């Protein structure tokens, strides 16, 4: 299974780094392919390095603008025109989407996949799993629930999103519900 992971390009607190490493090891040990944003630094570099060291297949998708910062040990690196095309390629290649902590770029990727789900542009069986390390996405979860309760977010979008407190819980969900 191709598991697309959205996460930060920046170095972050150790608790987030540990969860990224755990997720990457589980992806590799499960025989899955990691598909990620292609960057060689921050959490992106951590997940790629960890999956690679654990014997997993690593596929990067990176925009032309930052291709010089691409992860060098990827089994495959796809260079695309811009971040819009990068998001589409990441989403298209992933059988499931996993979201780790991140900033505006990660949030953009996440809301893009939710928009695609809302508009019927996403495979109906594609799951979105958000790893809620230390409650990082708790307010986002509450916002989605409020949007759903107020009629701004369709039930099928809510049903496609699963929040997991740990990478282990995320992978259990994926293994049980994945494509």
Predicted regions, residues:
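A charged, well-structured terminal subsegment
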Residues: 96, 150-179
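Short, acidic/small-residue loops that bind anionic groups at enzyme active sites
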Residues: 62, 100, 116-141, 155-157
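Short Gly/Thr/Asp-enriched flexible loops that form oxyanion-binding sites at enzyme active sites
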Residues: 45-50, 109-120
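Acidic/glycine-enriched connector segments
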Residues: 38-101, 105
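Glycine-rich beta-alpha loop segments
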Residues: 1-56
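Glycine-rich, charge-decorated loop segments at or immediately adjacent to ligand/cofactor-binding or catalytic sites
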Residues: 42-46, 136-148
């Amino acid at each position: 299974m191709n598991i697309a992971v959205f996460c930060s390009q920046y170095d972050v607190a150790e608790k987030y780094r540990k969860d990224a490493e755990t997720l990457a090891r589980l992806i590799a040990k499960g025989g899955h392919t990691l598909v990620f944003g292609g960057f060689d630094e921050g959490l992106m570099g951590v997940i790629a390095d960890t999956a690679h060291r654990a014997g997993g297949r690593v596929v990067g998708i990176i925009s032309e603008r930052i291709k010089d910062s691409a992860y060098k040990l990827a089994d495959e690196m796809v260079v695309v025109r811009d971040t819009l095309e990068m998001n589409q390629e990441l989403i298209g290649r992933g059988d499931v989407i996993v979201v780790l902590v991140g900033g505006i770029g990660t949030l953009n990727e996440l809301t893009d996949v939710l928009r695609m789900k809302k508009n019927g542009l996403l495979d109906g069986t594609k799951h979105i799993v958000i790893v809620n390390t230390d409650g990082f996405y708790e307010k986002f979860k509450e916002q989605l629930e409020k949007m759903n309760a107020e009629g701004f977010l369709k039930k099928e979008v809510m049903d496609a999103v699963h929040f997991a407190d740990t990478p282990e819980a995320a992978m259990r969900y994926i293994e049980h519900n994945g494509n």
